[in-house]
Every structure is written in C-alpha cells, then in structure tokens.
Amino acid sequence: MILELDCGNSFIKWRIITKSCSTLVSGGVVDSDTALLECLGNLSGAAFSDCRLVSVRSAEETAKLVCALADTFSISPVCAAPAPELAGVINGYDDFARLGLDRWLAFVGAYHLVKGACLVIDLGTAITSDFVEASGKHLGGFICPGMPLMRNQLRTHTRRIRYDDAEAEKALVRLVPGRATAEAVERGCSLMLRGFAMTQIEIAREYWGDDFAIFVTGGDAVLVADVLPGARIVPDLVFVGLALACPLR
C-alpha cells in the first residue's frame, strides 16, 4: 500500500491507498508531524511500503518529516518537485519553481480528469484559483486570504471581536445580516469567499464561454458549492496530481 501526504501550512492531510487500484484504505487530517506519526503508528491492517508527498513547508521542515517517516516506518518517501511541465500541463509562471506545489498538483490533477479547459478553486488557509486551457497551458491564477486567515486577522487586530469556534459554526447556518459579532464576521467572510468564486466563473467565461469544467477543493469548499452550479467537488484533487508527479512502480 501507498501512504500519500499533503503537507500544508496548517495541516497535514494523509491517506493510504492500495497500490494496485488506488482504493482508499484509510485517511485523515492532523495538525503536526508528531500527530501524524502517532496516528499512522496506531493503524491496524494498513501497512504501507511506499510513500509520496507534496509539501509547501520549508525545505528544512520537509526534510525533518521525511527523516522521521524513514526512521519510524522504514520507508523512503518520494517528494514532488517543481516542474515546467507535467502530464500535459504547462506551468504558466514566469519562474515555474515559485508556483506552490500543492496548487500545481491540484490543477494538473484536474486537467488529467477532464483533458479540457478547467477552472480550479482551492479553499484552504489561503484561497487560490487557476485557469488551464484545453491545450494544457496554465494561464495563471489568483491568491487571496481564506476563511481562517480573514477570521484570525479580525480577531487579532480588532479588540472587541471575540468569539469561539462553536459560535462561528452556528453563525454560518444562514447568510442574512448578522445581529451579533460572530454572525457579522463569519457571514461577511463567507460572502467574500462566494464573491471571489463567482468572479472566477466570470473570468473563465470570458476565456471559454461555457466550455470548461469547474473543480473545487479544500476544507471550505462547502461554503461556495451552492454558487458554483455544475462544479465538481474533489477533496483529494492534490493527490490526483501527486500520483502523476510521483508514480510508484
């Protein structure tokens, strides 16, 4: 079996799949290397012999995790690396190595699934969007703060904005004007996400009319799903691209 890791800025997403047909065996999300090692160590009946990962962390942090995995599980993790082209997709950045690896793999994965023009929106700590032509040419994209960053900035820099996660979750049940601070902040940030997503659709239509696919991924994908009719919600889109970047025999 294969262990796959998506090491983001805030969390590590992991899953174990079969080597023969990529069937999902187990998976989860943790907030630290220690939690990952503990979680994997407690699994029963899910032994893995191979590992591939993508990381947007520093080289030092990534190397530390790779060493820990090698020491603990006697595996040799294969790490995704920047590339000017992959699986028919041409990296659109002027300096291809500066494009975030998780972002790169997400839209490579999306293009692989449809072999046509696509818009990919990833809603995580940050929000990213990317546009890929039917030819595989990446036209570029946008980056803006995600829900966690917007929320935390307001909590950090505005003294009277204080509320807990339970209040935040309750506030998002509806999107009418808020009558409490948590409602006003959470709903306002949610509307900004939705507005961003709808603007991406408008831009994509300027390029391709209605002849394109929409992919949405990331932890907050559910917050925009209803304003993106026909969008494909693919939580593991980065892993689709990771398999293309790091094929294991």
Curated annotation (Swiss-Prot):
Domain of life of the native organism: Bacteria
One Gene Ontology biological process: coenzyme A biosynthetic process
Keywords carried by this UniProt record: ATP-binding, Coenzyme A biosynthesis, Cytoplasm, Kinase, Metal-binding, Nucleotide-binding, Potassium, Transferase
Pathway involvement of the protein, from the record: Cofactor biosynthesis; coenzyme A biosynthesis; CoA from (R)-pantothenate: step 1/5
Cofactor annotation: NH4(+); K(+)
Catalytic residues in the record: D102
Pfam families with a match to the protein in the record: Pan_kinase
Subcellular location: Cytoplasm
Annotated GO CC locations: cytoplasm
Cofactor note: A monovalent cation. Ammonium or potassium.
Record-listed K(+) binding positions: D122
Catalysed reaction, written as an equation: (R)-pantothenate + ATP = (R)-4'-phosphopantothenate + ADP + H(+)
Residues that hold ATP according to the record: D6, C7, G8, N9, S10, F11, I12, K13, T125
GO molecular function: ATP binding; metal ion binding; pantothenate kinase activity
Residues that hold substrate according to the record: Y93, G100, L101, D102, R103, T181
Predominant subcellular localization, coarse grouping: cytoplasm
EC annotation from Swiss-Prot or TrEMBL: 2.7.1.33
Family matches, as HAMAP family: Pantothen_kinase_3 (MF_01274)
Subunit structure: Homodimer.
Sequence similarity: Belongs to the type III pantothenate kinase family.
Function: Catalyzes the phosphorylation of pantothenate (Pan), the first step in CoA biosynthesis.
Protein name: Type III pantothenate kinase
Native source organism of the sequence: Pseudomonas syringae pv. tomato (strain ATCC BAA-871 / DC3000)
Taxon lineage: Bacteria, Pseudomonadati, Pseudomonadota, Gammaproteobacteria, Pseudomonadales
